[in-house]
């Protein structure tokens, strides 16, 4: 299998796409996400119903706008949240992962390695930068080609930088947007909200400010 396809070719495009990612709290503080395109249409969602202890879960599920399961992200034990694996669709017993993610164990090195299993064009990616600061880049390990970026989002109408619960995921041409969002979910599980600042403005994205 070649190209940037890993999850679903519906989310691969010939031009760069900028998605708006919003962390949500449906009932409790947790790991819910909604993801919108530049027109304000829902693209992905992640729902958390586990109550106040949702961060203790070992699995996170990425769905499309219609609730179809695209990816299941599962913590690999024992790993203290440093190692995660991705499964296509809804994970079943005995199913093999399609990729693995591991955080560097070297003190002071802020990088994450993504290993893709199987016959794909690129078998390894690096995620560099600070997810907590919403400033990191996904690159092909061998070529250093950028395939996705996570950045702080600025409100187009006011030119004000939004809080870190709303940020941009920029997906390069030919790269699987569902795979990119799956990596965002893993980063959120690995790093959590440790670097998030308190008291920043929270704004729900709409078509006007996407």
From Swiss-Prot:
InterPro entries the UniProt entry points to: LOR, LOR_sf, Tubby-like_C
Organism of origin: Arabidopsis thaliana (Mouse-ear cress)
Highest classification ranks of the organism: Eukaryota, Viridiplantae, Streptophyta, Embryophyta, Tracheophyta
Family: Belongs to the LOR family.
Main function: Might be related to the phospholipid scramblase and tubby-like superfamily of membrane tethered transcription factors.
Name of the molecule in the record: Protein LURP-one-related 5
Pfam families for this protein: LOR
